[in-house]
Amino acid sequence: MAGLRASLDSLRQMRGLFQKRIAAASRGPSSATTTIPSLREIAAFGSNPGNLRMFAHVPPGLGEKPALVVALHGCTQSARAYAVGTGWCDVADRHGFVVIYPEQQPSNNPKNCFSWFVPADTARDSGEALSIRQMIEKAVSEFGIDQRRIFITGLSAGGAMASVMLAAYPEVFAGGAIIGGLPYGSASNVQEAFDAMFNDRMPSARALGDRVRSAPKHEGRWPRISVWHGTADAVVKPSNAEHIVSQWIHVQSLQREPSELKHGAR
C-alpha cells in the first residue's frame, strides 16, 4: 500500500503540469489560427463491448482505396482535442486518407484513459480492444479502406493502447507509432500500471516478447513499429521506449544493433 500511496501522491503533484500540457496541445500554435477539424461521430459500428465512441475525419474528394490511420488520445483528452493538437486531419486532407479517433468515456475511466492495464480490455476480441477493431471494420466497409494500409498511433495511455492493438491484432496493421507509451503486457492492474509508468518495473525482453507472441498466436508478418518518447516526460518514464523496442526486437528475432543509423534534428 505504501507504494500505491507514493504513486498516487506523484500523480497528484503532476496533475497540474500534465493538464497544462494537454491544454496547450489542444489550443495548438495559436487560438487565432488553429482550424477546428471536421469530425463526425459514427454511433453504430458494432457491439462495442468496451463502451467507446467513434469519430472519423474524411477528407473531401476521397479517392478509391484510401489508407486509414487510427489515432488514440491520452488521458484527460478527447477525440476532438487530440485532432486539434496533433494535426492529423490536416495531414489527411493533404494526402487523402481517413482518420478515426476512438474516444474513451468517463464511465470507463474518470480521467478518460484507455484501459491498457485491464486484461478484459486488452485481450483479442474483448473489451476496448474489440471496440477499436470494430471501428476499423466499420471504416473499411464504409470508406473502402485499403486493408494493406491501416496504421495506428497513440499518445501516452493512447500509445499504450496502440501497443495493445498491434499485439492483439498484428494482421490488421501495416505499422504503428507508439508515442510516450508502454509495452504490451507491462501491467495487468492499477498498481502495476503505476510501477511501469514511474518506477520502471518491467519484465525481461524475452517475457515481454512472449506476451506479444502469445496474444494472437500470430504466424504471419508483424507490423512495423515506430517508437517516440520525450526525454522530459514526467508522466511515463522515457525508459519505456527502450522496453517497447526490446519487446518488438525479441518478437521479430532482430539484431539489437541497428542496420542503419540516421541522426535527425532535435
Specify the residue positions occupied by each region the protein language model found.
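A domain-start/cap signature at the N-terminus of enzymes
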Residues: M1-L68, R80-T86, R94-V98, Q147, ...
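Active-site glycine-rich loops that stabilize anionic/oxyanionic intermediates
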Residues: G74-S78
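Cap/lid segment of the alpha/beta-hydrolase catalytic domain
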Residues: E103-G127, V190
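Alpha/beta-hydrolase active-site loop
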Residues: A120-F143, V164
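Short beta-strand immediately N-terminal to the catalytic nucleophile in serine-hydrolase-like folds
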Residues: I152-G154, I179, W228
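Short glycine-enriched nucleophile-adjacent loop
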Residues: G159-E171
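A conserved short beta-strand
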Residues: V172-P183
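Short beta-strand/loop motif that positions the catalytic acidic residue
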Residues: V227-H229, D233
